[in-house]
A protein has these predicted regions:
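N-terminal helicase ATP-binding lobe
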Residues: 1-328
Length: 328
């Protein structure tokens, strides 16, 4: 970091970072050290140190962040270099947003660009944190991006206002409701082609937002489920639409013995010393009975579950679709 701060040729040094992933990681670690000093609320001397650090490095942070953002936004790099570069850029924008000397508008812009860069670095956790520092409403972050970065641009053609605005709104809607990803990506590419010859900032910011949208759609759960159908079962378990039970080794042995008894039509005597063991055995016997009698459902509940109004619910269900077995 000292090399960047004290060296006059800042841009040349940052350009070298894009060609050396180890350099990027080293700089990120050094920036983290600065970050903890800047956020430390202890002692007056730390507060003075904050002012001194801000005075010395905030301009360099800005140069690093915008240079990396511009290069990574306009050119293609290997994934790891791109990820590390966006991570560094996001971190710089986050540091800049802590500068109390900036206007509220500039602080918001820094937080927004930090959130977008964290997204492009596949650091969703930090991206969400930075986004929530600006607004709670899902639509507002996209609206903020549009207004902050396009309202100062002078449009020469009326189609640009309508098309860019429509594209941003569609991206926002798609990300909130998680649908029409492919259509929006195709539409965004169409707008990008129209903006190719523009040098007033439209292409730069719209490409950046499109990159973030692409990364978010690639990592969306619906996209992953389409690519890996088995994930559906996993998601259903996480959302408690399905339940998964794991047997202990001793319980598995009981299950195996019952299977053997059913297959060979022999009687097996199983001794279980605890009440819980007997409960398990009763449940397993009922389970095997249910599997051999299609259409019959049984709900096994402990006695306590039939108290405080739950008994009525259980009886009502049992009349319509199942047999309720009270367990003592």
């Amino acid at each position: 970091m000292e090399r960047l701060i004290n060296h006059k040729n800042v841009y040349r040094n940052i350009k070298n970072l894009l060609e050396n992933e180890n350099d990027v990681d080293r700089i990120v670690k050094r920036l983290i050290q600065y970050h903890f000093v800047l956020k430390n609320p202890d002692a007056e001397q730390i507060k003075e140190k904050k002012k001194e650090l801000f005075a010395d490095v905030i301009n360099v942070y800005s140069k690093i962040a915008f240079y990396l953002l511009t290069r990574l936004n306009c050119y293609e790099y290997d994934y790891e270099i791109e990820r590390a570069g966006f991570e560094l850029s996001a971190f710089c924008f986050e540091i800049i947003s802590k500068n109390g000397d900036l206007t509220d508008e500039d602080i918001e812009e820094s937080k927004l660009l930090s959130a977008i860069c964290y997204t492009l670095a596949n650091n969703s956790a930090n991206s969400i944190v930075m986004a929530h520092e600006m607004c709670d409403e899902k639509y507002e972050i996209y609206k903020l991006f549009f207004e902050r970065n396009f309202k100062k641009i002078i449009y020469n053609n009326t189609w640009q206002i309508d098309d860019i605005s429509t594209a941003v709104k569609k991206m926002a809607y798609s990300l909130v409701y998680k649908e029409n990803f492919e259509e929006e990506i195709e539409y965004n590419n169409h707008i990008l082609q129209k903006l190719r010859n523009n040098d007033d900032g439209q292409l730069y910011y719209f490409r950046l937002l499109t990159k973030a949208y692409q990364r978010m759609s690639d990592n969306s759960i619906r996209r992953l489920i389409n690519a890996f159908p088995d994930l559906t079962k996993f998601v259903n378990v996480l959302t408690q639409k399905e339940k998964v039970y794991e047997l202990w080794e001793a319980q598995k042995n009981v299950t195996d013995r019952l299977n053997d008894a059913l297959d060979s039509a022999k009687i097996s005597y199983i001794s279980l010393p605890t009440s819980a063991g007997k409960t398990l055995l009763a449940e397993l016997i009922l389970y095997f009975y249910v599997t051999q009698n299609s259409g019959v459902q049984l709900y096994i509940v402990p006695s306590l579950a039939l108290e405080n109004g739950e008994e009525y619910t259980c009886k009502r269900i049992s009349k319509s679709s199942c047999t309720c077995v009270e367990q003592r």
